[in-house]
Amino acid sequence: MYSGQTNLKDSVEYRPIDAGKLVLSPTRTYAPVIKKILSKYNSNEIHGMVHCWGGEHIKVIQFVDNSDVIKDNLFPVPPLFKLIQENSKTDWKEMYQVFNCGHRMEIYVPAEVAQDIIEISKSFNIDAQIVGRVEKSDSKKLTITSEYGKFEY
């Protein structure tokens, strides 16, 4: 049973499809991209990979010690997540904790490898960019800076 403010047939800002189709649109698989990356790079270059699904942005802090994972160049939040936030009135700190907000896959690599990983992704028509960095810290934490504020976890 659906009880949100937006009807499933309502149009969604900046999208040619209605809310129902937006919610039901398929998720892209990253398997071909990851396969190509792993055929070229090993654990010396790839320090970690996180699929942002279940635990979303905060999941990464399970895998670091004495590090601040700083995400300050995220992709724009897609209309679906804006719609969820507007209808639920969930604060953005919780949105980034619960939903990926359009940010789906993270690969932790040295800066000199990053551009090649981006080019591999783009060869599969998948947008990619450097979204942040990891810095030494006295504790483990995640800092997200977005158009909706700065959030620490």
Residue ranges, per PLM feature:
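Helix-biased detector of long, well-ordered alpha-helical tracts
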Residues: 1-153
